[in-house]
């Protein structure tokens, strides 16, 4: 059975978010096309996603010195445990659907923190004499991103940092098969906002058939 993680990073629901509306349309269509698959929702705004901080570095230092989990402080244990949970959940899935808004040319900070929980040497990638090699090959991902302007092409494509960073990190850990759906231009062309949303939903439903 294929396991799909529906990873969202938006404090708004589908009623208040173009991206979430498209994401939920995709998941609904996916479930209809693949009723045997398991879909798990991870709302990053309601999930413990530790940032890499002094506690985390201290914990890693203790592990490197040969000390065990019991040597960590309570704060270190809580953060490391949460990071491990996020990592293990991600590693044991087969498909990933990220739904994010663009905030100031990137995605919400919690997405970066989440990716930092995933890019762990010896778990999702390894170092070799020829450079790092991703360990999550054979998996695939979809990124649905909503932007007020148009960033998929033209002069502003170069500053779509969230899309580029997510694709780069996923590729680094071995997830090289990625799809992208842009829900864009709603603020630049408010009179076409509903049309843009409906077109993106149609695109998402079609993609769900072969994802």
Curated annotation (Swiss-Prot):
Its cofactor is FMN. Homodimer. Gene3D superfamilies: 3.40.50.360. Binds 1 FMN per subunit. Belongs to the azoreductase type 1 family. Its EC number is 1.6.5.-, 1.7.1.17. Quinone reductase that provides resistance to thiol-specific stress caused by electrophilic quinones. One of its GO terms (molecular function) is electron transfer activity. It catalyses: 2 a quinone + NADH + H(+) = 2 a 1,4-benzosemiquinone + NAD(+); N,N-dimethyl-1,4-phenylenediamine + anthranilate + 2 NAD(+) = 2-(4-dimethylaminophenyl)diazenylbenzoate + 2 NADH + 2 H(+). It holds the Pfam family Flavodoxin_2. It is an enzyme of class 1 (oxidoreductase). FMN binds at residues 102-105. This is FMN-dependent NADH:quinone oxidoreductase 3. Keywords: Flavoprotein, FMN, NAD, Oxidoreductase.
